[in-house]
C-alpha cells in the first residue's frame, strides 16, 4: 500500500490505528524489535511507520538538504526545530520524509489517520516546524513500512506480529530505547518472558 492509497481510502480498516509489535523471532533486520503504527489497512494492503528506530540525521540536516536554510541560519532556528526528532519509518521510500503529528496542524496535504493524529508529507509542514509554528506533537519519519494484499494478515497469522490499540503518548515519546518493551507492557506482556512462538492478540 502507498501514500496515494491512504489518501483515497473511504473507510478505516481493521488494523488502522493499531500497533504492530514484532515477535522475538522476527528475522527481517528492518523489523526486528520494532513497534509500527499502522496508518491504513485494507484488502489492498497496509501502510505504517516504525516508531522506535533513530536516524543519524537532525532536522537541521534535513533543512540544509532541502535548501531551506544556509549553514549560518541553523543557529537561529527556534529550539523546537533544533530538537525536532528524525526517525527511520521503514524500508519503503527511505529517502522520503513523512511527518506524523497531532491534529492541531492541518494543511491541504494533511491526511487524517485517526481522530487525533494526521500525516503530512509536504514541504509546508517542514517550513512551519522550522519557524516554530508547526504541530504541538510531531515526529519526522524517513520511509515507511508497506505490505501488499494479504501479506500482513499472513505474517500475523504465522505469529510474526502482535497487535494492540495504539497509544498516542508512545507514538510521540522521544525516548526510543525502551519503546519496544513499553509497547509490550500495554498488552501486559513482559518482553523477557515473551516466546518467539507465542500466539497473537
UniProtKB/Swiss-Prot annotation:
SUPFAM superfamilies in UniProt: VC0467-like (SSF143456)
Residue ranges of the TM segments: none
Cellular component GO terms held in the UniProt record: cytosol
One Pfam family linked to the record: DUF179
Superkingdom assignment: Bacteria
Alphabetized InterPro entries for the sequence: AlgH-like
Family matches, as NCBIfam families: PRK00228.1-4
Family per record: Belongs to the UPF0301 (AlgH) family.
Protein name: UPF0301 protein Arad_1256
Amino acid at each position: 500500500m502507498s501514500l496515494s492509497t491512504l489518501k483515497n481510502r473511504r473507510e478505516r480498516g481493521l488494523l488502522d490505528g493499531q500497533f504492530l509489535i514484532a515477535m522475538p523471532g522476527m528475522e527481517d533486520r528492518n523489523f526486528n524489535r520494532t513497534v509500527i503504527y499502522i496508518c491504513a489497512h485494507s484488502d489492498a494492503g497496509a501502510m505504517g511507520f516504525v516508531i522506535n528506530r533513530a536516524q543519524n540525521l537532525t532536522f537541521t540536516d534535513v533543512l540544509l538538504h532541502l535548501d531551506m536554510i544556509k549553514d549560518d541560519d541553523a543557529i537561529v532556528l527556534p529550539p523546537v526545530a533544533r530538537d525536532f526528532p528524525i526517525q527511520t519509518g521503514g524500508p519503503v521510500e527511505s529517502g522520503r520524509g513523512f511527518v506524523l503529528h497531532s491534529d492541531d496542524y492541518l494543511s491541504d496535504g494533511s491526511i487524517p489517520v485517526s481522530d487525533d493524529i494526521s500525516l503530512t508529507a509536504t514541504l509546508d509542514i517542514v517550513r512551519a516546524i522550522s519557524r516554530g509554528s508547526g504541530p504541538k506533537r510531531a515526529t519526522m519519519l524517513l520511509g515507511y513500512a508497506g505490505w501488499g494484499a494479504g501479506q500482513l494478515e499472513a505474517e500475523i497469522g504465522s505469529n510474526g506480529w502482535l497487535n494492540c490499540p495504539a497509544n498516542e503518548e508512545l507514538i510521540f515519546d522521544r525516548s526510543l530505547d525502551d519503546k519496544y518493551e513499553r509497547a509490550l507492557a500495554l498488552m501486559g506482556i513482559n518482553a523477557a518472558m515473551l516466546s518467539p512462538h507465542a500466539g497473537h492478540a
